[in-house]
Amino acid sequence: MEAAYLPTGPAPGADARGAERYTVLLRTAKLIADGAEYLCVLRDLSATGVKLRLFHRLPAGDMELELTDGQRFVIEPMWCDGDHAGFRFARPVDVRALLENGNDPYNRRKVRLNVAKQAEINVRGNQFPVRLTNLSAHGAGIICDVPLMQYEQVRLEVDTMPLLYAKVCWCRAPRYGLVFDFGFRLEQLAGHVAALQGLAAG
């Protein structure tokens, strides 16, 4: 997702953080709670805190925010209101550097969320167990003991998710990358990942 940012005035009420805030538009990120990864969207941030849009209830545990360029920040939840939550950074951050680095096309990449889930694939008319390792809007990573060929068509079955038709896009046996024939919208991906991580909807 592309992002834009604008400086805003002090936030009212529970969102007041003192430092100058920047409104961030369409910047996806990962919320990491006790090692489990969830999709979120940055809404505004300052040197001392950040407001996130969530797609599920707030998870419990020690938390970090990971941006698409790989930067990670330890955060602490301060409030939650519907599908938005406010967090405080464990230490102040350089907001301008953070945003400018995130806008660098060489640093920007699609959010890929790590999961660990048993699944099955159907290939060449046969069903085989696999291990799902990550999920994005347009693909997945799996571990499969059966050799797969690049560009081979497969069907991936994961718990309550819909059937996923995909092609093998890279092979490093036993690890393989799949690209879906039809991808997910942001909200769909967030919901599926939260369910796979054992987190109910908000």
Predicted feature locations:
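Structured alpha-helical
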Residues: 1-202
